[in-house]
Amino acid sequence: MLLLADMDVVNQLVAGGQFRVVKEPLGFVKVLQWVFAIFAFATCGSYTGELRLSVECANKTESALNIEVEFEYPFRLHQVYFDAPSCVKGGTTKIFLVGDYSSSAEFFVTVAVFAFLYSMGALATYIFLQNKYRENNKGPMMDFLATAVFAFMWLVSSSAWAKGLSDVKMATDPENIIKEMPMCRQTGNTCKELRDPVTSGLNTSVVFGFLNLVLWVGNLWFVFKETGWAAPFMRAPPGAPEKQPAPGDAYGDAGYGQGPGGYGPQDSYGPQGGYQPDYGQPASGGGGGYGPQGDYGQQGYGQQGAPTSFSNQM
């Protein structure tokens, strides 16, 4: 019964989750951050390396032809030692490696682990607590600040670990170790390197560190848009103002029926001359025209209601 109740709770959470956010840039980048953080701390924190060298003494019976030296994370190399023949009366000497590079390595792994945990928590919040996340806009603002902090921490930790890795390679190079071995400086003794440590996994961890830096810096923009702070910068440009008619244009100050320049009625051919009949007045001179004594009627066209001569004949 308890198992069934737990399954019901899980089903309710899954049903109420907004998994579409994983397809959006905000959620998809969080998934990438989560995965890349795992690769970053796994490739560094689980590393174990080994180098091999040989010491051939003048007295062949005292030689050690296959000396194996193992080291691992967190690279406190000053605590790593191996026994090498002193080439004097069958004795041995403890040889310690040089350097302590645990600070940069542990800092890098710590940032990766916390980034992994934060990405997982933020992704769960996006899916199951979307309303709480957007309530009062506090969720996006806190998310933005945390993303900015992690981006800075990835920059610092990746740079520090890249320098630390370079020092680890120098300290575990068999040639450099041989230079510090007193028996190898004695005449008649021969020291050789047999195998360099494989550091490809550590190189990969540095690459993942800077990839995480790119992801977290890029995600700043998507989280910034969720805060609403970008709204004033994303407004549409204002529309162009309407063009006002210039004074004197058509339908403007001198509009229809408002004198010269408009479209009001004017005398035929203008006031300067030309043929200008007035259909409402008698024709001058008593002769022709369209007045009362014309051929087509007894009165001009200006007098409405008067029958024409044609209508009288009808």
Swiss-Prot record:
GO terms for cellular component: clathrin-sculpted glutamate transport vesicle membrane; excitatory synapse; membrane; neuromuscular junction; neuron projection; neuron projection terminus; perinuclear region of cytoplasm; presynapse. This is Synaptophysin. The modification Phosphotyrosine is found at residues 81, 279, 296. InterPro entries: Marvel, Synaptophysin/porin. GO terms for molecular function: cholesterol binding; identical protein binding; SH2 domain binding; syntaxin-1 binding. The calcium-binding activity is thought to be localized in the cytoplasmic tail of the protein. It comes from Mus musculus (Mouse). Residues 21-228 form the MARVEL domain. The modification Phosphothreonine is found at residue 227. Homohexamer or homotetramer. Interacts with SRCIN1. Interacts with VAMP2; the interaction is inhibited by interaction of VAPM2 with SEPT8. Residues 1-25, 132-138, 225-314 are cytoplasmic. GO terms for biological process: chemical synaptic transmission; endocytosis; modulation of chemical synaptic transmission; regulation of long-term neuronal synaptic plasticity; regulation of opioid receptor signaling pathway; regulation of short-term neuronal synaptic plasticity; regulation of synaptic vesicle priming.
